Amino acid sequence: MTKTKIIGILNVTPDSFSDGGKYNSVDKAIARAKEMIDEGVDIIDVGGVSTRPGHTEVSLEEEMERVVPVVEQLVKLDVQISVDTYRSEVAEACLKLGATMINDQWAGLYDPKIFDVVSDYNAEIVLMHNGDGQREQPVVEEMLLSLLTQANKAEMAGIEKGNIWLDPGIGFAKSRSEEKEVMARLDELVATEYPVLLATSRKRFIKEMIGKETTPAERDEATAATTVYGIMKGIQAVRVHNVDLNVKLAQSIDFLKENEHERHHLS
């Protein structure tokens, strides 16, 4: 059965929009990681730089100090480790320790050396669509062009196609109407035949789906609805805060999709 991967978010930051400060010591971060493993997480994504609107710029040294000690301990656990960074130096330090995936919110545009680093360690990379929000093309066309250009650079650096993930970047450099367009046309990203990761968890897009004022933690059920929708569209992974809920939903949808596939196959 095709299994949708659940990537659990572990922010080791003081200022992330959903859980800033909650896991910003090594002990707290490891305790949360163990909880996620018990809940059935496939990959834990460690981030030391907040992406919330208005976040403070973090120096390379500070990002290293936040992330590396956590990764050093996480690699002792039985789980795949991803690091959410756009800096090749952080990527290299963490891959050297045993991380096997880099989640780059700038898709190699900020630091092109990241492709060579990921290739050297035969690791996976997530390329997220981002930008300044200014575009001359419609959003989906611009997203596809941008991501495929960066994916090609990743392949040229020696990263295997199956190790290159595409993320449509919900919550980044898009208007609300553009985000709705991207969600409706996720299957066009899936059609590129690169594995696709969807990361909507607790974001403003989810808040607007609900249609009323909510805290980030109150957006988990609506986030899970996008998990189901994404799986039906063909995505292969979701990046979420609430691992338990999304594991259960993804397993159930995977089962139902497989059942439908088998019935078609038999007939």
From Swiss-Prot:
PANTHER family: FOLATE SYNTHESIS PROTEINS, FOLIC ACID SYNTHESIS PROTEIN FOL1. InterPro entries: DHP_synth-like, DHP_synth_dom, Dihydropteroate_synth-like_sf, Pterin-binding_dom. One of its GO terms (molecular function) is dihydropteroate synthase activity. Its EC number is 2.5.1.15. Residues 1-251 form the Pterin-binding domain. It is an enzyme of class 2 (transferase). GO terms for biological process: folic acid biosynthetic process; tetrahydrofolate biosynthetic process. Keywords: Folate biosynthesis, Magnesium, Metal-binding, Transferase. It comes from Staphylococcus haemolyticus. CDD domains: DHPS. Gene3D superfamilies: Dihydropteroate synthase-like. Pathway: Cofactor biosynthesis; tetrahydrofolate biosynthesis; 7,8-dihydrofolate from 2-amino-4-hydroxy-6-hydroxymethyl-7,8-dihydropteridine diphosphate and 4-aminobenzoate: step 1/2. This is Dihydropteroate synthase. The keyword Transferase applies.
